[in-house]
Amino acid sequence: TTLFLGGMALTHGGEPYLLYNSPTKQRIMINLTYILNKMKVASMAMLLPIIACSCSMMHEDMGECKQELRLKFKYDKNMKFADAFSSQVKTLSLHAYNKNGEMVFDKTEAVSDIEAAGGYITLDIRPCVYSLQVWAEGETVYDGSYKYSTKGKAEDGIENLDCKINRDGRKVDHDLNALYHGMMGNVDLRMDDYGVKTFTMPLTKNTNNIKVVIQNASGKKLKASDFSFEIDDDNSWLDCYNDNIKEDSITYRPWSQYDGIVGAEESETQVSAVVAEMTVNRLFANKNPRLKVYNNENGKLVFNIPLVDYALLVKGNYNKDMTDQDYLDRQDEYSFVFFVDDGMNWLSASIFVNSWRVVLQNVDM
């Protein structure tokens, strides 16, 4: 009789043992069952570390053995309707508040670091219902452009996350960093199972570049010193919802003002012009900021126009279904071309807004 347990059949005289030794068949089958059960237990014992290791790897790589909340960001509320978050936003401050109004998460990070980490911020908070708020800035053109009320007590409430243009007096005559805002109120971050849950917060760009061009069509040479430019508004102080926290009057003055010639080609008529550039905070469709230009020679007002009304004159030319506020939030560059005669009087028959010619009627001076 020969007995092999290493995967070979049991034999008796060269033939299968179980066929020729029936009296012991039941006993041998019991022994085989016992051996197979032992082998099964041993195999399971060997698999346990592998399973544990696999779960560990999923925990680290796939997040299947834990709960992880990730927040991504996008800035596609622009006239190109394309996400420009990574290229235009440079720094970001994120705040999370629970239903009791307590700050439970606060993080400021460079967008380059966010992109390097996968394009998201991991929220180290328990999955629940939270309100999330963001203030963000673009490239630094003026250090300390804004003051943020974000470092108070955790129980102060999300309403205290306001932002104000940093200034000493009423006037601002320098450029401003691009300012962005994001808000998601009472967002449900709860999870039913382990794994990763990703949310995306859209951002709105608040700041706008206003370029004002004064041209003399008759050929008289204009100098930058001939005019003074300003925009009066009350939008310097915004709350956590991106609305006016209160009327806070501000006057924007040019951070760049120069003269030059329009139409440099020989085939074109050369026209003298003065250009002024200003950066203003968020424009509101229900507000009435005024763009004013003065003749410095005699101090007289050349014109005083409602900036928002004139900005909206060409909204329909973009063939997009937008409310007035949506257009003002998407458009961040406005170019206005005005014409004056030799006496520096405004020729108000027509103007150009963002290269669109507009024929004016019932001009509001």
Functional labels for PLM-detected ranges:
Residues 282-365:
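Hydrophilic extracytoplasmic domains
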